[in-house]
């Protein structure tokens, strides 16, 4: 049986890794081994931070809603409890957007939540 050399397969594999490593700095872009190591790390960070992004945005929305609630003289937790009692089903993303871009409408929602308490 003839000996099989890995030339073509290796070249394809290296090309794939180096293509994904575009944009990395210095040897991490040019050298296969370093590029491969950095690519593994990058994939790990990307996977982890896709989960983290959801937490970060929720935290941002809560901060914005809390700031708008304080302007309307109510705490965030009392506001959210009032919304639940008033059967107003708006999520935090919508509430944060409303607090930033439509303060008058947000104030009306705050009043409805206050009445329900």
From Swiss-Prot:
GO terms for molecular function: rRNA binding; structural constituent of ribosome. Keywords: Ribonucleoprotein, Ribosomal protein, RNA-binding, rRNA-binding. Binds directly to 23S ribosomal RNA and is necessary for the in vitro assembly process of the 50S ribosomal subunit. It is not involved in the protein synthesizing functions of that subunit. GO terms for cellular component: ribonucleoprotein complex; ribosome. InterPro entries: Ribosomal_bL20, RIBOSOMAL_L20_CS, Ribosomal_protein_bL20_C. It comes from the Bacteria. SUPFAM superfamilies: Ribosomal protein L20. The keyword rRNA-binding applies. It comes from Wolinella succinogenes (strain ATCC 29543 / DSM 1740 / CCUG 13145 / JCM 31913 / LMG 7466 / NCTC 11488 / FDC 602W). This is Large ribosomal subunit protein bL20. Pfam families: Ribosomal_L20 (PF00453). Belongs to the bacterial ribosomal protein bL20 family. GO terms for biological process: ribosomal large subunit assembly; translation. Transmembrane segments: none annotated. The keyword DNA-binding does not apply.
């Amino acid at each position: 049986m003839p000996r099989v050399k890995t030339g073509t397969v290796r070249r394809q594999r290296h090309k794939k890794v180096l293509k994904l490593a575009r944009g990395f700095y210095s040897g991490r872009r040019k050298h296969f081994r370093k590029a491969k190591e950095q690519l593994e790390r990058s994939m790990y960070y990307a996977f982890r931070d896709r989960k983290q992004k959801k937490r970060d945005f929720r935290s941002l929305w809560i901060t914005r809603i809390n700031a708008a609630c304080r302007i309307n003289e109510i705490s965030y937790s009392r506001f959210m409890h009032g919304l639940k009692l008033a059967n107003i089903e708006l999520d935090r993303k919508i509430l944060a957007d409303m607090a930033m871009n439509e303060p008058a409408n947000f104030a009306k929602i705050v009043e409805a939540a206050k009445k329900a308490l």
